[in-house]
Amino acid sequence: MSNDTQPTIAIIGYGSQGRAHALNLRDSGFDVTVGLRPGGPTEAKAQADGFTVVAPAEAVKTADLVAVLTPDMVQKKLYEEVIAPNMKQGACLLFAHGLNVHFDMIKPRADLDVVLVAPKGPGALVRREYEIGRGVPCIYAVYQDTSGKAEQFALTYAGGLGGARANIIKTTFKEETETDLFGEQAVLCGGASSLVQAGFEVLVEAGYQPEIAYYEVLHELKLIVDLFYEGGITRMLEFVSETAQYGDYVSGPRVIDASTKARMKDVLTDIQNGTFTKNWVAEYEAGLPNYTKFKQADLEHPIEEVGKKLRAKMVWLNGEQQAAATPAKQQAA
């Protein structure tokens, strides 16, 4: 490190997380450079935010800590062709997700410290909480400690993001990677979206209006999730009617039963043994044919057209939709 507490930092990537990390770290007093390919989609944004923007190969040459905040599937090539040949001896390589390292797609140089720092929230929230004097909890891990200071690198970085204002929990690359993938696939994204689509289909096929079905299985879900977020399942149960509580108790286990849990275990096994990652890499390298097909099927699901029409009448959503759309357009460095 340049000194005991303030490493010079290169942020590679300027999407949702990259921008939040760079801004928070700079406001915490760190010397931050942003590494982006010249003419890339986020170069102008980083420059407008006041950062020195250089090519990734240049950014990593003098940095004490290099944070790789690009999409998972571009990281291997980026590391092999740009980072590894140029990163200075004894520096720290940081990731926000352990996929590439845990599954040996990236094999870090032996002289480097290798750590993980993952805020448990989207980039916009990481930035917003920091600006109002709070923070988003962070988890961190050490994969390779060559200098003996790798853990301090991770804690210093997490603190610079504002994580110490909330909570910082130690994990491992294995645990972070496998639990993150499982949460996305079985519950947060795959599980929730499939449950909503199935509920919508059941009601519409039974003759109920699609608009009513949309409100009941998708729109009102936010109200429930907000209560989960604030105080767990028990808080949600405190704020719904006794009828809803009873329905939860007797019907929830009929929908999510032992067979569902067994299939969730199968999903976890595929994650743990590398099957999911192997398939995802093959899909990406083949040009995303199945990914494109699956995505189109979701876009064409009847709930999307119904929702689009109903949301157009919810004028209070306009600002939220614009804010939510921005990070999705900033995925590539």
Curated annotation (Swiss-Prot):
HAMAP family: IlvC (MF_00435). The active site is at residue 97. GO terms for molecular function: ketol-acid reductoisomerase activity; magnesium ion binding; NADP binding. Mg(2+) 2 binds at residues 180, 216, 220. Keywords: Amino-acid biosynthesis, Branched-chain amino acid biosynthesis, Magnesium, Metal-binding, NADP, Oxidoreductase. It comes from Xanthomonas campestris pv. campestris (strain ATCC 33913 / DSM 3586 / NCPPB 528 / LMG 568 / P 25). GO terms for cellular component: cytosol. It holds the Pfam family KARI_N. Binds 2 magnesium ions per subunit. Pathway: Amino-acid biosynthesis; L-isoleucine biosynthesis; L-isoleucine from 2-oxobutanoate: step 2/4; Amino-acid biosynthesis; L-valine biosynthesis; L-valine from pyruvate: step 2/4. The keyword Transmembrane helix does not apply. Substrate binds at residue 241. It catalyses: (2R)-2,3-dihydroxy-3-methylbutanoate + NADP(+) = (2S)-2-acetolactate + NADPH + H(+); (2R,3R)-2,3-dihydroxy-3-methylpentanoate + NADP(+) = (S)-2-ethyl-2-hydroxy-3-oxobutanoate + NADPH + H(+). SUPFAM superfamilies: 6-phosphogluconate dehydrogenase C-terminal domain-like (SSF48179), NAD(P)-binding Rossmann-fold domains (SSF51735). Residues 172-317 form the KARI C-terminal knotted domain. Its cofactor is Mg(2+). Mg(2+) 1 binds at residues 180, 184. The lineage of its organism: Bacteria, Pseudomonadati, Pseudomonadota, Gammaproteobacteria, Lysobacterales. Belongs to the ketol-acid reductoisomerase family. Its EC number is 1.1.1.86. The keyword Transferase does not apply. This is Ketol-acid reductoisomerase (NADP(+)). Residues 1-171 form the KARI N-terminal Rossmann domain. Involved in the biosynthesis of branched-chain amino acids (BCAA). Catalyzes an alkyl-migration followed by a ketol-acid reduction of (S)-2-acetolactate (S2AL) to yield (R)-2,3-dihydroxy-isovalerate. In the isomerase reaction, S2AL is rearranged via a Mg-dependent methyl migration to produce 3-hydroxy-3-methyl-2-ketobutyrate (HMKB). In the reductase reaction, this 2-ketoacid undergoes a metal-dependent reduction by NADPH to yield (R)-2,3-dihydroxy-isovalerate. NADP(+) binds at residues 14-17, 37, 42, 72-75, 123. PANTHER family: KETOL-ACID REDUCTOISOMERASE, MITOCHONDRIAL (PTHR21371:SF1).
